[in-house]
Amino acid sequence: MTNPIEDITKNADLIMLVGSNPEEAHPVVGMQIRQAIKRGCKLIVVDPRDIGLAKKADIHLKLKPGTNVAFANGIMNVILSEGLQDDKFIAERTEGFEELKEIVKDYTPEKVAEICHIDADDLRKAAIMYAKADRAPIIYCLGVTEHSTGTEGVMSMSNMAMMVGKLGREGCGVNPLRGQNNVQGACDMALSRMYIQDIRRLLILQFVRNSRKHGV
């Protein structure tokens, strides 16, 4: 989680809900999303299913299962085409942007529409709505992660958020709803014994990089 649940449901101007049916799987979050909609928050649902919240959505993109990466690339293609990226955030807080531009340049709305079985204009509208909203979190669940490309799907959504500067701010971020109680918290706090060694290596590597950067 990059943001607390209360923050993303009470402070968001738009919510992008991807591969998640919180009213059934996470009812407290589902209730909070409905409350956010009542106060005027926009909702984009990205899900092949006709979930309850899709009836309240401004846009419902019914992706073909397993095409989340292409969808995210298409969103980023539109953001760049429309000049809606956050250049300051990208320059100061990201790396590899030119490589990402090269990857997504061929994922036009028309191409993504064919891959994902969605309407190209709806994809454009969703991308522009997401980019222009001041505070817009992405909330996702197992509908993204339970694929062979689950990791890539999450990374692609993270790239989306960074492209428009929606990380590290109130009412934004990339936020997973998981399958068991506090499984995300355990991972975020490096308490998962399955990955403890890998996490330690990453922390050490980051420490070394920061030390070199600041001449320590």
PLM features per residue range, with description:
Residues 1-181, 196, 200-216:
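Cofactor-pocket helix-loop regions in the catalytic cores of large enzyme subunits
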Residues 184:
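N-terminal beta-loop-helix "entrance" segment that forms/cooperates
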